[in-house]
């Protein structure tokens, strides 16, 4: 089993990197995890809708170029389906039972994901109707993946 977290932009702050490293270590016994960052598109602060779409398209192509054809793609979207921690564990378990073993979670940049990435998605997942910084979202996501594995194995952690 392999899980990839694919995201736009570079993780900059040391504390986010440390949190990610901790969960990568914790996930070691359960799955191979890889974090891939694609560069975010430099853009002015006040963009037109057309400029926003162009930024999303460029970032989207970078993301799509990193997704393996056989990978099950789970995009993080505000309009996606909200799951509990148990629900995420069940969703992953169901897909693994169906023979899926390569998962790519995709986190877009500050303007969201391009339509081409959304069309490649096998599952749209939402953590909230609120917007989170995409650097923070990586930490939240990797923690929830770890929690899902603990739930699937019936191990103490989730309360």
Curated annotation (Swiss-Prot):
<keyword id="KW-0489">Methyltransferase</keyword>
<dbReference type="Pfam" id="PF02590">
    <property type="entry name" value="SPOUT_MTase"/>
</dbReference>
<dbReference type="GO" id="GO:0005737">
    <property type="term" value="C:cytoplasm"/>
</dbReference>
<keyword id="KW-0698">rRNA processing</keyword>
<protein>
    <recommendedName>
        <fullName>Ribosomal RNA large subunit methyltransferase H</fullName>
        <ecNumber>2.1.1.177</ecNumber>
    </recommendedName>
</protein>
<feature type="binding site">
    <location>
        <begin position="127"/>
        <end position="132"/>
    </location>
    <ligand>
        <name>S-adenosyl-L-methionine</name>
    </ligand>
</feature>
<dbReference type="InterPro" id="IPR029026">
    <property type="entry name" value="tRNA_m1G_MTases_N"/>
</dbReference>
<keyword id="KW-0808">Transferase</keyword>
<feature type="binding site">
    <location>
        <position position="76"/>
    </location>
    <ligand>
        <name>S-adenosyl-L-methionine</name>
    </ligand>
</feature>
<keyword id="KW-0949">S-adenosyl-L-methionine</keyword>
<comment type="similarity">
    <text>Belongs to the RNA methyltransferase RlmH family.</text>
</comment>
<feature type="binding site">
    <location>
        <position position="108"/>
    </location>
    <ligand>
        <name>S-adenosyl-L-methionine</name>
    </ligand>
</feature>
<dbReference type="GO" id="GO:0070038">
    <property type="term" value="F:rRNA (pseudouridine-N3-)-methyltransferase activity"/>
</dbReference>
<dbReference type="InterPro" id="IPR029028">
    <property type="entry name" value="Alpha/beta_knot_MTases"/>
</dbReference>
<keyword id="KW-0963">Cytoplasm</keyword>
<dbReference type="InterPro" id="IPR003742">
    <property type="entry name" value="RlmH-like"/>
</dbReference>
<comment type="subunit">
    <text>Homodimer.</text>
</comment>
<comment type="function">
    <text>Specifically methylates the pseudouridine at position 1915 (m3Psi1915) in 23S rRNA.</text>
</comment>
């Amino acid at each position: 089993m392999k899980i990839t977290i694919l995201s736009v932009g570079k993780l900059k702050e040391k504390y986010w990197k440390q949190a990610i490293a901790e969960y990568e270590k914790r996930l070691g016994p359960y799955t191979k995890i890889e974090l891939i960052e694609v560069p975010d598109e430099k853009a002015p602060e006040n963009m037109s809708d057309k400029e926003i779409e162009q930024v999303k398209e460029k970032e989207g192509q970078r993301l799509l170029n990193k997704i393996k054809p056989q990978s099950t793609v789970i995009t993080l979207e505000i309009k996606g389906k909200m799951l509990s921690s148990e629900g995420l564990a069940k969703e992953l378990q169901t897909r693994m039972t169906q023979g899926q073993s390569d998962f790519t979670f995709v986190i877009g940049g500050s303007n969201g994901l391009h339509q081409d990435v959304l069309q490649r998605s096998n599952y749209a997942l939402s953590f909230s109707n609120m917007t989170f910084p995409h650097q923070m979202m990586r930490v939240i996501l990797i923690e929830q993946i770890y929690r899902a594995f603990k739930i699937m194995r019936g191990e103490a952690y989730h309360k």
